[in-house]
């Protein structure tokens, strides 16, 4: 994330890392279903985030759901919530929904183009993360 004079509220921080989330997966908890018309994999996870604007832990219930249709196209949706403190030291929660779509021809890509959505009860996080910039 940016330097000491960075403003969070309503300022686009192009090319700067604003949060780095560390995810932990227990492979024994992964569930999957594969049938003639597609495949579903549910990957529960835990984790945390430390950044200049927010520090917190993922509450139980975080899951990444990957659905692949018969044509081999995949939809991925991760939903999880953090509890922690914002930049001002106030306790808050941050919900994250991250959606990505990958065509059969793109499955081997190193990264997936994903589109996050944030909901929070923190005024400072809400002003920044609720903008249509991600």
Go through the PLM ranges and name each one:
Residues 2-134:
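Beta-strand-enriched cores of mature, soluble protein domains
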């Amino acid at each position: 994330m940016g330097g000491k004079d960075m403003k969070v509220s309503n300022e686009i921080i192009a090319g700067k890392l604003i949060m780095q989330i560390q995810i932990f997966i227990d492979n024994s908890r992964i569930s999957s279903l594969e049938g003639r018309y597609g495949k579903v994999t549910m990957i529960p996870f835990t984790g945390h985030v430390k950044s200049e604007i927010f520090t917190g832990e993922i509450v139980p219930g975080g899951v990444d759901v990957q659905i692949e249709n018969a044509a081999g196209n995949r939809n991925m949706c991760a939903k999880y919530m953090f509890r922690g403190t914002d930049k001002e030291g106030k306790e808050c929660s941050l919900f994250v929904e991250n959606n990505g779509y990958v065509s059969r021809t793109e499955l081997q890509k190193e990264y997936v183009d994903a589109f996050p959505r944030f909901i929070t009860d923190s005024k400072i996080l809400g002003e920044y993360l609720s903008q249509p910039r991600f």
